[in-house]
Amino acid sequence: MSKTSIGLDKVQSAELADKLNELLATYQVFYTNVRGYHWNIKGVNFFALHAKFEEIYTNLVARVDEVAERILTLGYTPNNAYSQYLKISRIKEDIAVSEAQECLSGTLQGLKTLLDQQREILAFANNANDEGTASQMSDYIKEQEKLVWMFQAACQTCHN
């Protein structure tokens, strides 16, 4: 069995890097969507939502960098072209969204998509004995589960 420079199985690491590149794409498209919500939100809840979306997209920028660096740590190259991201992202571009309910719903659905994808990667990383990736995914999942709860609550009482 051939090993990577950090002692992981090369075949499993290559597959994990592919999964992480798909996650990177999902994060990048979600980031762009949330940035658009921040710019274009309208309505009575503008100030609160404008600030919340900025908080979220700022966090997403950090996650993008961390996922890309994990791919590099595994010995592979992160995708860096937006055209690649659009092909493999599990989230599609959200175009011309400005109503609060749509922005909240888009954010909630994006978070749920990330959770599903990260849980798949967590399971694969655990099977590959990749504690670094597993720990990273576990941290993201914990953080995003709380955000899902908050956005579900916000979607129930949203005013357009």
UniProtKB/Swiss-Prot annotation:
InterPro entries (alphabetical): DPS_DNA-bd, DPS_DNA-bd_CS, Ferritin-like, Ferritin-like_SF, Ferritin_DPS_dom
CDD domains tied to this protein: DPS (cd01043)
A GO term for molecular function: oxidoreductase activity, acting on metal ions
SUPFAM superfamilies reported for this sequence: Ferritin-like (SSF47240)
Family: Belongs to the Dps family.
Protein name: Uncharacterized protein HI_1349
